[in-house]
Amino acid sequence: MIGITANADEFVYKSFTTADIATMLGALCAFLLFNSRFFHLKQAAVFLGDAGSTAIGFCIVYLLIDFSQGSSALISPVTAGWILGLPLLDGSAVIGKRLLSGVSPIKPGRDHIHHILLDAGFSVNQTVGTLVLIHSLLVFIGVSAKLVAGFYADMFLFWLFVSLVFLRIIMTNLISRYSIASAKR
């Protein structure tokens, strides 16, 4: 009887988590609808802000940690990192670059990838489209490699992600040097 109760408790917990995910996805879809510029809107109608971004990030990370831990883990921790994809890659690269430069990692700056694209002349829609494409590619690589290679993919995927962070730092340095050299001409 205790085993049935424990299984029912876990089922209710997972169902509650599923309801939470569905609610969060619905809210995010509504936000994206009001924030898109596809309906001839010149600017976003809703501003998410720091608190909203932090809350969404916390919920996503909480769910990924929950799904990647324990005996009934649905995904591996490395796959969770690839699902986070672009925000994790960009944040790691920016923090790494700032630390290597001797700058505080929490100092504001225009070295995030969306700033780089906007400064390079991309429109807001082009920037969003590019970021969605890059993130989708990262998620596809992480999830498909895990499905194909199974357990042995974790170490490869981890080092591939670390390599991408360093590649992002190098590319950002090259772009900024090229931009500075072009501006001096």
Regions found by a protein language model. Give the residues of each.
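Alpha-helical transmembrane segments
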Residues: 1-184
